[in-house]
C-alpha cells in the first residue's frame, strides 16, 4: 500500500545522502557470564564498541565528528563512558583514545531531531528485515528494495559474544 511505498521512498531518500550506518550488539547472557563484566550495562558496552568503530571511520575526517544519540535512561552512564574513552584507551571497549570525536555526546528526543528520526527509520527497517518474515508478496518486494538500500550504506554489523 501507500505506507509501504512511502517507507521505501523515505529509506531511499536517507540513503541517498550516504550516511555511515552501523549496528553493534552484545550477547547479554555471555556478558553476564564473563568474569569482570557481570555488572556492565549491555547498552553502554554496545554503544562503546560502536563509538570505537565510528572513531576508526572518523580518522578520515580532519575536523572530527559530532556524536548525537537518541535519549535513553542510561545517557549519563553513556556520557561517562564516552568521556573516559576520549581521554584514554579502555580495555575491551576501545583501541585507543577517541580523540577524533568531538568532546561532548549530545542526547535528544528523536521526535525533535530529523537526524535521529532518520536513524530510527533505518534501524527500524534493518531490525524488521532481520526478525520479521513478510508474508504478503508486495511486502516482500518492498522489504527487498529497502534491504538493497540499507546494504549500500551499512558499514558495520556485529554482535560481540564475550
Regions found by a protein language model. Name each.
Residues 1-162:
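Phosphate-ester processing/binding pockets and catalytic centers
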Amino acid at each position: 500500500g501507500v505506507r509501504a511505498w512511502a517507507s521505501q521512498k523515505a529509506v531511499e531518500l536517507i540513503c541517498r545522502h550516504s550516511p555511515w550506518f552501523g549496528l553493534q550488539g552484545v550477547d547479554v547472557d555471555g556478558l553476564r557470564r564473563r568474569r569482570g563484566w557481570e555488572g556492565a550495562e549491555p547498552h553502554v558496552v554496545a554503544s562503546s564498541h560502536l563509538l570505537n568503530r565510528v572513531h576508526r571511520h572518523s580518522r578520515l575526517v580532519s575536523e572530527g565528528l559530532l556524536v548525537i544519540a537518541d535519549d535513553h535512561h542510561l545517557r549519563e552512564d553513556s556520557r561517562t563512558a564516552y568521556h573516559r574513552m576520549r581521554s584514554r584507551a579502555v580495555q575491551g571497549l576501545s583501541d585507543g583514545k577517541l580523540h577524533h570525536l568531538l568532546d561532548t555526546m549530545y542526547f535528544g528526543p528523536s521526535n525533535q531531531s530529523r537526524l535521529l528520526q532518520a536513524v530510527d527509520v533505518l534501524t527500524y527497517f534493518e531490525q524488521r528485515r532481520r526478525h520479521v518474515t513478510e508474508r504478503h508478496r508486495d511486502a516482500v518486494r518492498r522489504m527487498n528494495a529497502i534491504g538493497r538500500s540499507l546494504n549500500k550504506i551499512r558499514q558495520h554489523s556485529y554482535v560481540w559474544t564475550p
